[in-house]
Amino acid sequence: MILVAGIVLGIIVLIAGLAVAPHAHADPDTDYANQLHGYGIYGLKDYNAWIGKNVCKRLYSGVDADAFKSAAFVSASLQRGTSTEQVWQFVDAAVNMYCPDERPVVQRAAERR
């Protein structure tokens, strides 16, 4: 009987612990950094996320009229030695992660490249 009571108490404690445990949530900046790493683009996660989010802000506000202007902004913001291909991968990943409604802008640029 004591053994059963101990098991029941253990289960109650376990359930209570699960109920108050913080829930895991996706971190888009980490996902973005991981995608960039796949392209060989490294750097501070927060800085790269800031650049990526600014790509979207610049497209939304009209500062960048097209993805070519966004790519120029990214190229100037990333480390020297970043290839043109990596710049475009960065822009594409930024749009996919932070402003997917701007996909047509990147698609038009891809058709012109």
Model-found features: residue ranges?
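Bacterial Sec-dependent N-terminal signal peptides
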Residues: M1-A5
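Bacterial N-terminal signal peptides
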Residues: G6-L18
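C-terminal region of N-terminal signal peptides and the immediate post-cleavage residues
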Residues: A16-D31
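Short N-terminal segments immediately surrounding and downstream of signal-peptide cleavage
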Residues: P28-Y42
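Extracytoplasmic/secreted proteins, especially bacterial periplasmic and envelope-associated proteins
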Residues: D31, W50-N54, Q86-A94
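Short, surface-exposed acidic
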Residues: I41-A49, G81-V87
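Amphipathic alpha-helical segments that form the core helices of the histone-fold
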Residues: A49-V63, S75-L78
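Compact alpha-helical subdomains of small soluble proteins
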Residues: V63-R113
